[in-house]
Amino acid sequence: MSGVLVVIPARWAASRFPGKLLADLGGEPLIVRTCERAAAMATADRVLVAVDDERLYAAVTAAGYEAVMTGEHACGTDRVGEAAAASDAEIVVNLQGDEPLLDPVDMDRTVHALHEDGEADIATLAHPFVDEQEWRDPSAVKVVSDDWHHALYFTRAPVPGAHPGGEGDAWRLARRHVGIYAYRREALARFLALAPHPLEKREGL
């Protein structure tokens, strides 16, 4: 068992913009731009797009990338799990289909984090917020971590909280989560075996 498999879950439906993954971005569909970024990762041995619609499949394969049709799933991670089931990759990277601007060097860091820390099972990315307005935006997922960069909580709410009048620059203490996860194969299997938690469903994460 070895190697790194990057799976890009891509579904047609979207609450605000159905079919957005085929939106033009510099002459190519958004999903193809995301594939280009994934393929540029130094750590990636294989890039696979897990789709639920023939239009997405056609766009991805026409651009020369590998795609697989998947069934109905409640979340992208479940779709990744189905696509990765036939692979023996040691690490599976879940890269969201609408992340065409991520730097491949940063994406590689998630894989390196697992190689460097034998006790870590999952790695992801986050960066500082630009300002308080971005921090308050519910579409921006927040993560609060400890001094060792272990995530404590992911939420759409503006965290950390503060006593009335003491909020100040609380937004500087959180980070904005980025849509990529690197899993050890066993950790992904354990996650997929869990029932969705009420907090997960409430937050839509």
Label for each model-derived stretch:
Residues 6, 47-49, 92, 122-123, ...:
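Hydrophobic/aromatic residues located in beta-strands of well-ordered beta-sheets
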Residues 104-194:
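Conserved core of the sugar-phosphate nucleotidyltransferase
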Residues 3-50:
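N-terminal glycine-rich phosphate-binding loop and ensuing alpha1 helix
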Residues 48, 54-112:
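Short phosphate-binding loop-to-helix
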